């Protein structure tokens, strides 16, 4: 639907002063949502949410991606804090960081 300039102005104007979110809040939200900005990372998070923990090899078996690609996605999730890992000899066990997930949910709720 094409609007006239007058209609567009009427639609987009408000008498209320909008408050911008705190910079730290916005940066936190951007960082955590960026970690979920790829479908493979969303699938990894979903997989880890449904399991208590998961070895890297088990994650690779569930994903239609090369092991190196899965490792890169896990690295991003770990760097943003959504995922934690524990090294057990030659194996790496991954799990969801429940505090970070709760923080993400709280940030989204504040939108």
Where are each of the predicted segments found?
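N-terminal leader segment of winged-helix/HTH proteins
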Residues: 1-36, 82, 107-108
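N-terminal helix-turn-helix DNA-binding core of bacterial DNA-binding proteins
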Residues: 27-68, 92-99
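A cross-family signal for key residues in well-ordered alpha-helices
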Residues: 46, 78, 105
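Alpha-helical residues within the helix-turn-helix
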Residues: 61, 72, 78-79
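Short, structured secondary-structure boundary patches
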Residues: 65, 90-92, 106-110
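Beta-hairpin "wing" of winged helix-turn-helix
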Residues: 78-88, 95
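Short, charged/polar, Gly/Pro-enriched secondary-structure boundary elements
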Residues: 99-105
């Amino acid at each position: 639907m094409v609007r006239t300039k007058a209609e567009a102005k009427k639609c987009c104007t408000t008498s209320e002063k909008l408050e911008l979110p705190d910079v730290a809040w916005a940066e936190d939200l951007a960082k955590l949502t960026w970690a979920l900005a790829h479908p493979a990372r969303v699938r990894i998070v979903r997989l880890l949410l449904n399991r208590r923990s998961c070895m890297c090899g088990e994650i690779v078996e569930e994903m239609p991606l090369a092991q190196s690609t899965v490792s890169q996605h896990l690295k991003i999730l770990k760097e943003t804090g959504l995922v934690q890992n524990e090294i057990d000899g030659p194996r790496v066990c991954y799990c969801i960081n429940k505090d970070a997930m709760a923080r993400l949910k709280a940030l989204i709720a504040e939108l």
